[in-house]
């Protein structure tokens, strides 16, 4: 069985679920899951878990994301990106200095509050926001805390036809809406704005350079070399602390045993996780602090081997 993380270069126009469906079809396996929705109009890095790796999906969705975005200042849209209808227009009469733009971007770095857009999959009252939006209903959305680790302009500001546009790169926490960020940058500069282009260039330490397209996946599937192009579970979890155990403990982990907590993890909070490695170098499980028993750790996820392995 195929196990590992496929780094897919998602094309524009496809949903994340479309990608999962196509990967299942190409690889003839049902055990496929993506690690977080990427809007249809956005291309770029979409890690897809296959086989045993589907058990670690939740640990990959939390990784920070890197985007290359373009903002157009001068009008805003219903969807906050280039696909929506214009809702507000205010022509830019004079060029905006790059110093002013850079100063505005700098104000967004750090932990900030963001209100999710109406055209998004965020659920309120058991219903997705885009479902309300399609009915022409706008509802109040609570703001959410996000982190902008880095944001900087990457191209000169282009002034033409009453608009100013430029590209920027942003490294941000999960759940950040870059189109909303573009709108807020415009507001900071005194104009309506929208995101006119977006590509995800990184997810955690996975980069666009490592990704393959669906067409390339078809080719390597026919060649029988899919395994060579997958990220092993062990590397996919390298953002977690590592606990290397001996053979005695390994047999206990295989059975989901509760284990004494090593001193190095004594500081763990309830939400912290550690990747447990067998002497062979295989990641066997993900452990967590026991919620009720002091100085003990329990399995959060057991990554069983396939029967044929």
UniProtKB/Swiss-Prot annotation:
<dbReference type="Pfam" id="PF16198">
    <property type="entry name" value="TruB_C_2"/>
</dbReference>
<comment type="similarity">
    <text>Belongs to the pseudouridine synthase TruB family. Type 1 subfamily.</text>
</comment>
<dbReference type="GO" id="GO:0160148">
    <property type="term" value="F:tRNA pseudouridine(55) synthase activity"/>
</dbReference>
<dbReference type="GO" id="GO:0031119">
    <property type="term" value="P:tRNA pseudouridine synthesis"/>
</dbReference>
<keyword id="KW-0413">Isomerase</keyword>
<protein>
    <recommendedName>
        <fullName>tRNA pseudouridine synthase B</fullName>
        <ecNumber>5.4.99.25</ecNumber>
    </recommendedName>
</protein>
<dbReference type="InterPro" id="IPR032819">
    <property type="entry name" value="TruB_C"/>
</dbReference>
<feature type="active site" description="Nucleophile">
    <location>
        <position position="39"/>
    </location>
</feature>
<dbReference type="InterPro" id="IPR014780">
    <property type="entry name" value="tRNA_psdUridine_synth_TruB"/>
</dbReference>
<dbReference type="InterPro" id="IPR020103">
    <property type="entry name" value="PsdUridine_synth_cat_dom_sf"/>
</dbReference>
<dbReference type="InterPro" id="IPR002501">
    <property type="entry name" value="PsdUridine_synth_N"/>
</dbReference>
<dbReference type="GO" id="GO:1990481">
    <property type="term" value="P:mRNA pseudouridine synthesis"/>
</dbReference>
<dbReference type="GO" id="GO:0003723">
    <property type="term" value="F:RNA binding"/>
</dbReference>
<dbReference type="Pfam" id="PF01509">
    <property type="entry name" value="TruB_N"/>
</dbReference>
<keyword id="KW-0819">tRNA processing</keyword>
<comment type="function">
    <text>Responsible for synthesis of pseudouridine from uracil-55 in the psi GC loop of transfer RNAs.</text>
</comment>
């Amino acid at each position: 069985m195929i196990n590992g993380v496929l780094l897919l270069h998602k094309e524009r126009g496809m949903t994340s679920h479309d990608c999962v469906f196509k990967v299942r079809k190409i690889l003839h396996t049902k055990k496929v899951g993506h690690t977080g929705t990427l809007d249809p109009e956005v291309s770029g890095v979409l890690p897809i878990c296959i086989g045993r790796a589907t058990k670690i999906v939740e640990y990959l969705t939390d990784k920070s994301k890197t985007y290359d975005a373009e903002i157009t200042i001068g009008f805003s849209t219903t969807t906050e990106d280039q696909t929506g209808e214009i809702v507000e227009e205010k022509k830019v009469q004079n060029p905006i200095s790059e110093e002013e733009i850079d100063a505005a971007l700098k104000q967004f770095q750090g932990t900030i509050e963001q209100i999710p857009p109406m055209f998004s999959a965020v659920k309120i009252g058991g219903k997705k926001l885009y479902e309300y939006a399609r009915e022409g209903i706008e509802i109040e959305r609570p703001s959410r805390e996000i982190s902008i680790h880095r944001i900087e302009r990457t191209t000169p500001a282009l002034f033409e036809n009453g608009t100013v546009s430029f590209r920027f790169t942003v490294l941000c926490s999960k759940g950040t809406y870059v189109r909303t960020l573009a709108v807020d940058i415009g507001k900071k500069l005194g104009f309506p704005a929208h995101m006119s282009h977006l590509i995800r260039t990184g997810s955690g330490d996975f980069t666009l350079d490592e990704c393959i397209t669906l067409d390339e996946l078809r080719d390597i599937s026919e060649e029988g070399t899919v395994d060579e192009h997958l990220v092993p579970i062990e590397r996919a979890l390298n953002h977690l602390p590592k606990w290397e155990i001996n053979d005695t403990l390994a047999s206990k982990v295989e059975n989901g045993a509760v284990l004494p907590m090593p001193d190095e993890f004594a500081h763990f909070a309830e939400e912290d996780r550690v990747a447990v490695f067998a002497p062979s170098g295989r990641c066997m499980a993900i452990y967590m602090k026991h919620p009720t028993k002091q100085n003990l750790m329990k399995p959060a996820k057991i990554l069983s081997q396939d029967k044929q392995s």
